[in-house]
Amino acid sequence: MFDGFLRAAAATPDIRVADCKFNGASAAALVSEAYEQGVSLLVLPELCLTGYTCSDLFLQESLLDGAQKALITLAESTRDRNMIVLAGLPLTVNSVLYNVAAVLHDGEILGFVPKSYLPTYSEFYEGRHYHSGADIETEILFNGRKYPFGTKLLFRCRQMPAFTLGIEICEDLWVAQPPSIGHALAGATVIANLSASDETTGKDIYRKSLVSGQSARLVCGYIYADAGEGESSTDLVFGAHNLICENGSFLAESERFCNQMITADLDLSKLVSERRRMTTWQPKFNDDYRIIEFDLEMHPLELRRYIDPHPFVPDDRTDRARRCEEILTIQAMGLKKRLAHTHCQHAVVGISGGLDSTLALLVTVRAFDMLDMDRKQIMAVTMPCFGTTDRTYHNACELVHRLGATLEEVDIKAAVTLHFSDIGQDPSKHDVTYENGQARERTQVLMDIANRLGGMVIGTGDMSELALGWATYNGDHMSMYGVNASVPKTLVRHLVRYCADTADSETLKETLLDILDTPVSPELIPPEDGQISQKTEDLVGPYELHDFFMYHILRFGRHPAKVYRLALQAFAGVYDAATILRWLKTFYRRFFAQQFKRSCLPDGPKVGSVAVSPRGDLRMPSDACVTLWMQELDEIVE
């Protein structure tokens, strides 16, 4: 356990029906295996110390005594193992039999949680043997000592309070109001379900939907351990369908009909962050719940979890295509509404031959098609200046032609040169004034053309540029509607690729592919030998890194050190530690310093879970200090 991560396991032991000694030894073997794998929470199935299918044998004292002895032995196997283990058994309390989960830690029993809902329908007959433990909160005597017993028990790690465990048993999940709802609202971040769910055709799909839905609804980790081979096959077969889910996403799933252990690293700090962000998450400080604390040693964990280096871009090609179509539609629908509301008949787009302006033009074309407006009323303006290359100029012109928009060329060299003369700027000095003077001239041209036509200037800047402040204030920073404002650079590339793949013209596809192949550049510095000399990623860092940083910082509010650690894993073999740390510091420094630009952004549609609009997802002071975050980064030892 480290950095808010918890390695959890769900395991199905090999059992023999009613052979408690064998079953206890089998469970203990899984404890040893889990310990070797660095597991901090091991969940075993319902009634695994006896077998779920003992039926009327549950009324035999020999079986019940054997289960207790097996539990005592199993508890001892957890000593000095730095883990929590959950195991199921039948337990008699005040002459009444309960189906319970025992919570074991460091050789001790922490408590017992009974099953609330007992199915007595179809193939199930639990009401014949057991009583419901719903709403029971007491202490019981077991093996000469008193232990907590009840459904409202939570188990919390002192060293990492984000690890707070709630427990339910099998059918408890299948009812209208599962106990896990109360557990989560009382503070549980992890729900363990000890289950014995038999297999019938199609049941696995429904089971997965229950686990996924509950995990998402409760913003929690959900570990589901299922009974498997070894249970009686008199009437039923059990598939050992083990599942580990986090906030609706499956981290691990066992192969059915094969007893095995699955493990996954739950990100508990992410769950806490998500709950904190959602103001509709309203915990109930319920005095009925009893918190039982335990100790676990904190140690670095070599993550087995896949960390997506491109969190804004789906890996699956089909899903990516669907997502691209959806995003393009959202962008176009936003612009469509603005055009219709303003009765605007013209759109003005500055087109450079780069990715962002290409996407903005493609979106504008979609919006005009939705409105049944003539594409010729889209004024695509190319404004060559000192840094423009033949390649980008040609691609800009070709793109406009293939899309059927109107092309207007305004060479701004003379205007910018005159402006430099007016303000005393040396044109041979390629500083920020030299660059920003061109950007602001372009914006002025676009705004004035829009006024001439009674049109609207469509913004081209993307979210990655806005996060870094890589935009000229009141230059390309400004427009009348910014269609790309919540689209990160890594996603821009895939959106343009999708448009190329679905283009109805081979020449349009070729143009888009060449634009994709062109280095990202503002082209504000003169080229060298006709080639782009100013490459954005050489100056501010790789956009794939910055998009990764942005996602984890804005979406989950992670500590800088954790962002760094995740990036090391996500980009292993791509960037070394020094490179990642260098650009992470750059991101934080620029992100804080450039907020003043984001504080006055034009309107634009939100397309994903992260956005930087000052009216929506990011309401941040423009003069906040970055010191706290930089100090944490300075403490990192590479």
Question: Language model features by range: what are they?
Answer:
Residues 1-350, 366-375, 407:
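Enzyme catalytic cores with a strong preference for nitrogen-chemistry domains
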Residues 6, 23, 161-163, 220, ...:
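ATP/NTP-dependent adenylation/nucleotidyl-transfer catalytic domains that generate, transfer
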